[in-house]
Amino acid sequence: YDFTHDRVLESSSPNHVQPIASVTKLMTANVFLENNRNANCTASITDDDYDYIKGTHTKLPKYTPISCNELLKAMLVHSDNYAAHALSRSAGMSRLQFIQKMNEKARELGMRSTRFSDSSGLSDSNISSAMDLVKLAKYSLNKTQIKNLSNMPNAFIQAGGRSVFVKNTNKLVREEVFDAAVNKTGYI
């Protein structure tokens, strides 16, 4: 998709609906940034954040207050599922309310084929189409934090007096192959 000229360059089944995995985290970031009212918020990784679906792990320490900005960084750079769940709990609403906000935002953006059931993308029930994801990417371009974090090759996450090194899950970003406006990988 060419954002400059607002046109499709090439497509194959652009409206086909399928699971979107961690691309979900772009919506999580948008909803968090728009709804969090506490600039100094912190959250801890807890047992509630455990990945019972795929058994993924986190490099972040459990039961340690971590700033929401650092969790956002861990989520967008390293695609940390636990950070996504912790962020959804820290935006001043329940996890279920947060997911409802994600679905409301999708409808607001005209993403008719999109449904979210969790904030990390672990569930195969998070579905969308390529054309809907173009709408999400275009919307995400308005958030400098999302653009900057999704394009970082690596980062240090400050967590409880520790500095945790993480790499971007996107090899094209890590190796600086090209410069894209917004990046996010997803794997089912």
Task: Describe each region flagged by the PLM.
Residues 1-131, 135-144:
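Active-site-adjacent loops and short helices of periplasmic peptidoglycan-processing enzymes
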